[in-house]
Amino acid sequence: MALQAQQQPTPSPTRDRVGSGEWLADTEKLPGAAASPEDVVVASTHHAAAAARYVPPRATSHTAEPNPGRDGGGGWYSWNGARRARHDPPAPRRQQPAKTHPPAPPLPAAPPPPPPPPPAASPAPAPRAPPPHAQVRSADRVVPAILSRKRRAAVMQRAALLARAAAAGXXLAALTVLAADTRRGWARDSYSNYAQFRYSEAVNVVGFLYSVFQFVALAELMRRNTHLIPHPKRGLFDFTMDQVLAYLLISSSSSATARASDLTENWGSDSFPNMANGSIAISFVAFVVFAICSLISAYNLFRRDM
């Protein structure tokens, strides 16, 4: 029967689709199938066909069914043909939206650390006392400067006093000589007959009076150390008057000189023009003294030492 099975075509085994899960009842196995799987020959005594099939060795793992069904009748089977129930995978779970927890409220900001306390103010170091030799040196410089300034002021006061006295004397001598020149010479002429001589006489009078006033004021200053007229513009007044009187003296003396020269050229040398020339010469000396007084008053105005 084995030889007859080899000559016939090998039918493919089919499963019972009725849901029994076993092979057909009319299929029989040979006695030697349990001993050696390699020599297994399946014989079918079914009335439709008898065929034998060689079953190769298979692994013990599950093998997919060659014709699985969709209606639940199929399943899994092992190498020996035993059918096993197929376990369908569980239905996928409906994807739920991920639960998001609300964000935690922000923590309150920590207060800034208090500023560091300011460093304690260290007491200022006491000023170092200057060395004694420096004090002595500064005193040596200051005291002589003060003394020299005082000496210079005293010298200028004495010089101004002498200049005022000289200006007063010169102006007095000039006006006295010219005033005495009356009814002189062969013509018995007088200075009052000529404008140039009258002009010179008037300037000498004013110069004399001003010089006497300045002499008294300087004497009072040197004796009591106080000004006769304590006015802030006193220095400017002295400087202006000295300049004006010096200019008047030089102009009056020049005009009187021209007139005396004209008389000498026209009428010859005589006592009248000679006395006029003497007064004019003294007026020039008074002009020089007033120029010196103007320099002293300018020094006092800009240096304020007196």
UniProtKB/Swiss-Prot annotation:
Residues covered by region (Disordered): 1-139
Main location (coarse class): membrane
Gene Ontology CC, one term: plasma membrane
Biased segments, Low complexity type: 40-60
Superkingdom to which the source organism belongs: Eukaryota
Ranges facing Extracellular side: 180-201, 261-277
Leader sequence segment: none
Biased composition range(s): Pro residues: 100-133
Keyword set, alphabetical order: Cell membrane, Membrane, Transmembrane, Transmembrane helix
Protein localization: Cell membrane
Residue ranges that the UniProt entry lists as topological domain Cytoplasmic: 1-158, 223-242, 299-306
Transmembrane segments: 159-179, 202-222, 243-260, 278-298
Membrane topology annotation: Multi-pass membrane protein
Similarity remark: Belongs to the Casparian strip membrane proteins (CASP) family.
Subunit structure: Homodimer and heterodimers.
Name of the protein in its database record: CASP-like protein 4A1
Originating organism: Zea mays
Lineage, highest ranks first: Eukaryota, Viridiplantae, Streptophyta, Embryophyta, Tracheophyta
